């Protein structure tokens, strides 16, 4: 039998030293918080306009935030579908208005359309 070859320990390059700051701690990148946009402050403002003496729990606020996100997503999906049907590359206020009429029920759709029209008019006039 042939003698086994001796294994040499693989030589690794020495690890780079950590940079030391003036305070003596190691220099690390700070983790930045991922900002999540919510409608919580706006929901709270509307609640105080309608019922100034009533509060809302954090869980209920989270549910309302999810509801608004879901509704906006439905409107965006429907308006993009309408633009595709009409072979238009752009979603205009007309597609949004029609999508709102399709997504929201009855009287709520009428109020949403009138408030949206009012907001667009105010935006274009300023």
Curated annotation (Swiss-Prot):
Residues 1-27 have a biased composition (Basic and acidic residues). SUPFAM superfamilies: Histone-fold. Coiled coil: none annotated. Keywords: Acetylation, Chromosome, DNA-binding, Isopeptide bond, Methylation, Nucleosome core, Nucleus, Ubl conjugation. The keyword Magnesium does not apply. It is found in: Nucleus; Chromosome. The modification N-methylalanine is found at residue 2. The modification N6-acetyllysine is found at residues 7, 12, 18-19. GO terms for cellular component: cytosol; nucleosome; nucleus. Core component of nucleosome. Nucleosomes wrap and compact DNA into chromatin, limiting DNA accessibility to the cellular machineries which require DNA as a template. Histones thereby play a central role in transcription regulation, DNA repair, DNA replication and chromosomal stability. DNA accessibility is regulated via a complex set of post-translational modifications of histones, also called histone code, and nucleosome remodeling. Belongs to the histone H2B family. This is Histone H2B.5.
């Amino acid at each position: 039998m042939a003698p086994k070859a001796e294994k040499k320990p693989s030589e690794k390059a020495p690890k780079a030293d950590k940079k030391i700051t003036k305070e003596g701690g190691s220099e690390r990148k700070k983790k930045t918080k991922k900002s999540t946009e919510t409608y919580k402050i706006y929901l709270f403002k509307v609640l105080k306009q309608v019922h100034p003496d009533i509060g809302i729990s954090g869980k209920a606020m989270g549910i309302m935030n999810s509801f608004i996100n879901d509704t906006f997503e439905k409107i965006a999906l429907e308006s993009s579908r309408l633009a595709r049907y009409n072979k238009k590359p752009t979603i205009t206020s007309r597609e949004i208005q029609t999508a709102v009429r399709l997504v929201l029920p009855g009287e709520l759709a009428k109020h949403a359309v009138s408030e949206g029209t009012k907001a667009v008019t105010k935006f274009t006039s300023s």
